[in-house]
């Protein structure tokens, strides 16, 4: 069982989407169920509407799930598991205040040591715990042995017990910490493989230790994806616009192109342009590079142009939403436009009222002639017919003709454009 477990705390990051895509692909390859779990236990950071937005984005990318969970609805199970660990003396109540812990951290810092919880409350007698009225957290006792696990991308990883510490699993408000909720949910939902960003590597031994302490012995496999760098080679920040999937979509980049690019990023693929369904046939998670991958917006836009060309004409007409059969004309314009947004602007420029500027007189002459001109099969015949009837020459012919046909003084060669614009010429002459 594979899962994608986002938090509804902001726009979906492309790194999260990449993890969702890879989990979905692997689930399909293994013929396993795919879980979507909304990790909403950090109530202070949750943003209204983001849960639905996550589902909408996944649907746009063709990612479906067989099971849907809300993490906060599992709170009773988290508390039951915490009580089990306390009753078995594997976890303990810790009454240390934030101020006390901070003072110990500062002391360790001055001594040049890494701070580790010193076990102050670990050996408290049961009666002392019962009689103490201070707020408390619950800590899981640190492991006693080296923890090892295999990562499909990073290989063999090991963590020494002193580097894991006796960490908090339940807060003073009786809500679980991220690692505890995540580990318990994965256990209850029978997750068998976790694919996520490498920023979670340090969480893995803690989650393994939680499940082991609860007596869960089913093997879990992992793949931690390398971080995505921005175009300057620095870890991509959530503050950067194109790190947001929502921003990319609103910019007119197709879901299929984004998926194509993210699958290809830091990965060897048999071809450059492909669909998600095609990738399912050959994708290999172990072939993903260990090294961070640099995000290249220009490359993504290039891929987007190719995906626009792949769209069926009737579907592209719906996307453009201009009530005309403009698919072939729009695909021709991918030599200039890289996104659906840019294509819509090109189409509007063609079919909206135009500013003739200094060529107003010439444009009026040409428009009158174009209303009834014969639509020749080739551009040369069309051009020669119009030249002879208009008595215009050079710049005073070609510039106004370009404005009438495209809405711009610059653009593609009119001879190249003609086969795609021909059927609309009579209409354009009447705008």
From Swiss-Prot:
Binding annotation for ATP: 238
Record SUPFAM superfamilies: An anticodon-binding domain of class I aminoacyl-tRNA synthetases, Nucleotidylyl transferase
Principal localisation: cytoplasm
Motif 'HIGH' region: positions: 6-16
PROSITE patterns: AA_TRNA_LIGASE_I
Motif 'KMSKS' region mapped to chain: 235-239
GO cellular component, one term: cytosol
GO molecular function: ATP binding; glutamate-tRNA ligase activity; tRNA binding
InterPro entries: aa-tRNA-synth_I_cd-bd, aa-tRNA-synth_I_codon-bd_sub2, aa-tRNA-synth_I_CS, aa_tRNA-synth_I_cd-bd_sf, Glu-tRNA-ligase_bac/mito, Glu/Gln-tRNA-synth, Glu/Gln-tRNA-synth_Ib_cat-dom, GluQ/Sye
Any GO BP: glutamyl-tRNA aminoacylation
Keywords for the protein's UniProt record, in alphabetical order: Aminoacyl-tRNA synthetase, ATP-binding, Cytoplasm, Ligase, Nucleotide-binding, Protein biosynthesis
Enzyme class: ligase
UniProt subunit comment: Monomer.
Main function: Catalyzes the attachment of glutamate to tRNA(Glu) in a two-step reaction: glutamate is first activated by ATP to form Glu-AMP and then transferred to the acceptor end of tRNA(Glu).
Family: Belongs to the class-I aminoacyl-tRNA synthetase family. Glutamate--tRNA ligase type 1 subfamily.
Matches recorded under HAMAP family: Glu_tRNA_synth_type1
PANTHER family from the UniProt entry: GLUTAMATE--TRNA LIGASE, GLUTAMATE--TRNA LIGASE, MITOCHONDRIAL-RELATED
Protein's UniProt name: Glutamate--tRNA ligase 1
Organism name: Campylobacter jejuni subsp. jejuni serotype O:6 (strain 81116 / NCTC 11828)
Upper lineage: Bacteria, Pseudomonadati, Campylobacterota, Epsilonproteobacteria, Campylobacterales
Encoding gene (name): gltX1
């Amino acid at each position: 069982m594979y899962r994608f477990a986002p938090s509804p705390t902001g726009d979906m990051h492309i790194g999260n989407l990449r993890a969702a895509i890879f989990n979905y692909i692997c689930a399909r390859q293994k013929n396993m169920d795919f879980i979507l779990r909304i990790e909403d236990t950090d109530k202070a950071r949750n943003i209204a509407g983001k849960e639905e937005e996550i589902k909408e984005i996944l649907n746009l990318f063709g990612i479906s799930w067989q099971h849907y969970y809300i993490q906060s609805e599992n709170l009773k199970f988290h508390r039951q598991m915490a009580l089990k660990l306390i009753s078995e003396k594997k976890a303990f109540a810790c009454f240390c205040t934030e101020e006390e812990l901070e003072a110990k951290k500062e002391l360790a810092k001055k001594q040049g040591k890494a701070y580790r919880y010193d076990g102050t409350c670990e050996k408290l007698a049961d009666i002392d715990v019962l009689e103490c009225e201070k707020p408390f957290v619950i800590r899981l006792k640190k492991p006693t042995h080296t923890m090892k696990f295999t990562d499909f991308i990073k290989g063999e990883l090991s963590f020494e017990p002193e580097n894991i510490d006796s960490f908090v699993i339940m807060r003073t408000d009786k809500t679980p910490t991220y690692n505890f909720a995540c580990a318990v949910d994965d256990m209850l939902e029978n997750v068998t493989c976790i694919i996520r960003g490498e920023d979670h590597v340090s969480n893995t031994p803690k989650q393994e230790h939680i499940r082991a302490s609860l007596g869960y012995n089913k093997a879990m496999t992992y793949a931690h994806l390398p971080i995505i760098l921005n175009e300057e080679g620095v870890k991509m920040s959530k503050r950067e616009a194109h790190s947001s999937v929502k921003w990319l979509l609103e910019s007119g980049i197709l879901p299929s192109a984004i998926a194509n690019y993210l699958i290809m990023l830091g990965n060897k693929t048999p071809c450059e342009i492909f669909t998600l369904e095609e990738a399912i046939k050959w994708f290999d998670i172990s072939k993903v590079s260990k090294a961070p991958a640099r995000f290249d917006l220009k490359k993504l836009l290039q891929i987007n142009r190719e995906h626009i060309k792949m769209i069926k004409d009737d579907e592209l007409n719906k996307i453009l939403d201009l009530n005309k059969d403009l698919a072939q004309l729009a695909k021709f314009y991918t030599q200039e436009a890289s996104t659906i947004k840019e294509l819509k602007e090109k189409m509007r420029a063609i079919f909206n009222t135009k500013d003739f500027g200094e060529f107003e007189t010439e444009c009026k002459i040409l428009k009158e002639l174009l209303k009834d001109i014969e639509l020749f099969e080739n551009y040369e015949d069309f051009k020669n017919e119009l030249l002879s009837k208009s008595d215009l020459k050079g710049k005073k012919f070609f510039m106004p003709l370009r404005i009438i046909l495209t809405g711009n003084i610059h653009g593609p060669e009119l001879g190249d454009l003609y086969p795609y614009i021909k059927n609309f010429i009579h209409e354009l002459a009447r705008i």
